[in-house]
Amino acid sequence: MLLNDSSTIACEVPVYLLPAEVAYYQRAGFTISIPRSHAAVTGHIDVLQLRNGYVHILDYKPDADKVMPLSQLVLYALALAARTRLPLKLFKCAWFDDKTYYEFFPLKAVYPLRAGDTAADT
């Protein structure tokens, strides 16, 4: 796969989000579904790509059409944004298997809708 892939920059990328970073994002108005803890949240990004001006975080999930790992992928995006100092608006997240591919913007997943906005506006 990687031999002819000009978009993938890394596989199995370890990421972590410190408790202070979780608190920072929560103070900034992000909705994050994670319990308060004194330990870092850790994980591994399966595939990291640069495509069309976005950093793509891809996670392989068997039976991708039966799972919804939004919280996990949002945490990975927040962790990578914290490490790289890139704004969250430059990230896209996706999960996939051999038959399906689902993609979303993590920024839309963490910001509550403002009064008068609809999901289509964001």
Show the residue positions of the predicted features.
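Catalytic cores of nuclease domains that cleave nucleic-acid phosphodiester backbones
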Residues: 1-52, 87, 102-107, 114
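Compositionally biased, intrinsically disordered low-complexity regions
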Residues: 31, 96-100, 118
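Nucleic-acid nuclease catalytic cores
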Residues: 40-112
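Intrinsically disordered, low-complexity terminal regions enriched in charged/polar residues
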Residues: 109-122
